[in-house]
Design a protein with these regions (language model features):
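Pyridoxal 5′-phosphate
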Residues: 1-221
Length: 221
């Protein structure tokens, strides 16, 4: 309504559910490859043709130039004007296969399974004294990505202690500092369940958090 451009960071949603950019009506949608079982160093950017045609290239090199003059150049049609030089060929092939694999599993099936895992583990996490789970408390309104904090402990310390228990989580800002500022927290720990995780993994997380609480009973390191 006000002429703003809507850019969606879909790195944490594209791997977990069906995405329809037409229904979202966003101007841009971006996601990374490694969160979709693909390789690092590659991602996907969707953009409405209107904006992509207006934008100037940000990198320059072979295959994106139409004509070169002494003081000016013209660019090829979309998408080539944004794909300068030798692309990450191996990464593109690998990401394509990863996306095909997820499509074969079915994004709706993945989302449904994650909801089941969330429904299993959320009550267990919510029952831990001093633990705050961020986001919807109803598993029907979330994926398997669960951000949390333990009272009085920095998420980095929590992540280190969980690692000692054999449980890998992410700790930090998660590229969402404005949201964390709104929540009035410096950072969070984040457990990410996916289609390859099980209820046994969920139980292991809960056990590791309880062990972490015991470890820090007398204060941080």
């Amino acid at each position: 309504e006000n002429g703003g451009v809507i850019v969606v960071d879909g790195a944490q949603s594209a791997p977990h559910m069906t995405i329809d950019v037409q229904a979202l009506d966003c101007d841009f949608f971006a996601f990374s490859g490694h969160k979709m079982c693909g390789p690092t160093g590659i991602g996907v950017l969707y953009g409405k043709r209107k904006w992509l045609e207006e934008m100037e290239p940000v990198e320059f090199g072979g295959e994106m130039i139409d004509f070169v003059e002494l003081y000016d150049s013209t660019w090829k049609e979309l998408p080539w004007k944004f794909e300068a030089g030798t692309p990450n060929i191996a990464g593109a092939i690998a990401l394509g296969h990863a996306i095909d694999y997820l499509q074969e599993l079915g994004m709706d099936n993945i989302h449904r399974y994650e909801e089941e895992l969330a429904a299993y583990v959320l009550p267990k996490l919510q029952a831990i004294d001093g633990l705050t789970v961020y986001g919807p408390q109803d598993p029907n309104f979330r994926t398997g990505v669960i951000a949390f904090n333990l009272d009085g402990l920095h998420p980095h310390d929590v992540a280190t202690a969980l690692d000692m228990e054999g449980v890998a989580v992410r700790a930090g800002h998660h590229c969402a500092q404005p949201l964390l500022k709104y929540l009035e927290v410096s950072a969070t720990a984040r457990a990410s369940f996916y289609f390859y995780n099980t209820t046994q993994d969920a139980d292991r997380l809960v056990e590791a958090i309880m062990a972490t609480k015991e470890f820090f009973k007398h204060g941080t390191i």
